[in-house]
Swiss-Prot record:
Assigned protein family: Belongs to the complex I subunit 4L family.
Source lineage: Eukaryota, Fungi, Dikarya, Ascomycota, Saccharomycotina
Disulfide-bonded cysteines: none
PANTHER family: NADH-UBIQUINONE OXIDOREDUCTASE CHAIN 4L, NADH-UBIQUINONE OXIDOREDUCTASE SUBUNIT ND4L
Record-given protein name: NADH-ubiquinone oxidoreductase chain 4L
Gene Ontology CC terms: mitochondrial membrane; NADH dehydrogenase complex
Principal subcellular localization: mitochondrion
Single GO term (MF): NADH dehydrogenase (ubiquinone) activity
Keywords of this entry: Electron transport, Membrane, Mitochondrion, NAD, Respiratory chain, Translocase, Transmembrane, Transmembrane helix, Transport, Ubiquinone
Length: 84
């Protein structure tokens, strides 16, 4: 799990395409959420499941905001390549 997280973190740092960055951030949040659920099951903690649900909700909101900004940028400029 740690190897997957660090690999995705390096992918996030090395990308210059905005869509790839959004996907990498979403997968990073999903990795953290899976780890929290796993540890909550190991220690029989219900609050970790609620926290994971909160993280998934925030990830969905972040994804919606990012994609709406991307669509707005595309409508304004006509292209999306190399925004960063």
């Amino acid at each position: 799990m740690i190897a997957m997280f660090t690999t995705l973190l390096m992918f996030y740092v090395s990308q210059n395409n905005i869509i790839s960055l959004l996907i990498a951030i979403e997968i990073l949040l999903l990795t953290v959420t899976v780890k929290i659920i796993y540890l909550g099951g190991q220690f029989d903690d219900v609050q970790s499941t609620m926290f994971a649900l909160f993280i998934i909700t925030l990830a969905g909101a972040e994804s919606a905001i990012g994609l709406s900004l991307l669509v707005s940028y595309y409508r304004l400029r006509g292209k999306v390549t190399n925004i960063l």
